[in-house]
């Protein structure tokens, strides 16, 4: 980690942090109002506290926490969602539902609105937006060539410019033809095509991510982002940039969460004769913690 806090300031920083916390209401707010350049107290003086969660215990998707995205991305100026994806996103029960206190996002092969595949994509924008935190998701993956589920984050307001100048945080991406591996990635730099990315992957010693549930965790602090699978830390990022702005931009603004299953696209490739449908991403819970 870059040395953001010098040793000589540790004691005074903690005193100010503790004093400010004593003046703050104990009630948790969905949105964190920390300043973009606020430096946290030392790790040893903080404690993660739950500030937002969805345990999927309702009969339908909680509209106070999530919004749907629809279609092919054409309405957003991103036909194929910018990746030449093949699915149409809907809010139909065929594509998204809650059962046994778990969220199911289902990719299907079917003709719908001019596309050959359907799926679902939801996001927490303006309902769950956070600057820094611990993000924990327990989920079971689908599998198959061309199947591309993701748990990721985008800036709520693109204050530094278009993608990826304002950043993207991929908590977990998974390619269905590599069922024992997941990826964690940051996107930043300039606006496309001057964007860059950095990341790593985690591979199971045995079995597949589609065999059972696994816990995917991301810890995001000032100047450092860490990834975990089932509590095992597998990468840390603490060096990035965005054009025209100093570190730690762009990862010093509020981001929201996105859950989706894409079909096809530039990275996974398209489904083939080996791909079986339907395919499900099943999410047990989403939990967000922040230091208080």
What name fits each language-model region?
Residues 18-20:
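C-terminal motif of bacterial Sec signal peptides marking the signal peptidase cleavage site
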Residues 23:
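Short, conserved catalytic or interaction motifs in soluble domains
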Residues 26-292:
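GH16 jelly-roll
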Residues 14-15:
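Short, linear, compositionally biased motifs with a strong N-terminal bias
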Residues 1-9:
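Bacterial N-terminal signal peptides that target proteins for export
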């Amino acid at each position: 980690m870059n040395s953001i806090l010098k040793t000589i300031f540790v004691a005074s920083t903690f005193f100010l942090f503790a004093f400010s916390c004593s003046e703050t209401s104990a009630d948790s707010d969905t949105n964190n109002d920390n300043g973009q350049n606020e430096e946290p107290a030392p790790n040893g003086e903080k404690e993660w506290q739950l500030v937002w969660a969805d345990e999927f215990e309702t009969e339908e998707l909680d509209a106070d926490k999530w919004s749907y995205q629809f279609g092919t991305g054409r309405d957003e100026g991103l036909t194929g969602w910018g990746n030449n994806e093949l699915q149409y996103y809907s809010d139909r029960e065929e594509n998204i539902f809650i059962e046994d206190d778990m969220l199911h996002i289902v990719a299907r092969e079917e003709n719908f609105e001019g596309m050959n595949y359907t799926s679902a994509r939801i996001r927490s924008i303006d309902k769950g937006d956070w600057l820094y935190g611990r993000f924990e998701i327990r989920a079971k993956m689908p599998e198959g060539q061309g199947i591309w589920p993701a748990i990721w984050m985008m800036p709520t307001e693109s204050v530094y410019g278009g993608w990826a100048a304002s950043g993207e945080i991929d908590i977990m991406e998974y390619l269905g033809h590599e069922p024992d591996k997941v990826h964690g990635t940051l996107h930043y730099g300039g606006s496309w095509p001057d964007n860059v990315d950095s990341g790593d992957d985690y591979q199971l010693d045995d079995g597949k991510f589609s065999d059972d549930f696994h816990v995917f965790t991301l810890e995001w602090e000032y100047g450092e982002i860490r990834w975990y699978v089932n509590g095992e830390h597998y990468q840390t990022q603490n060096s990035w940039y965005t054009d025209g702005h100093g570190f730690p931009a762009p990862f010093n603004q509020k981001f929201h969460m996105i859950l989706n299953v894409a079909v096809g696209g530039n990275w996974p490739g398209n489904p083939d004769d080996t791909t079986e449908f339907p395919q499900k991403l099943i999410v047990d819970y989403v939990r967000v913690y922040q230091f208080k």
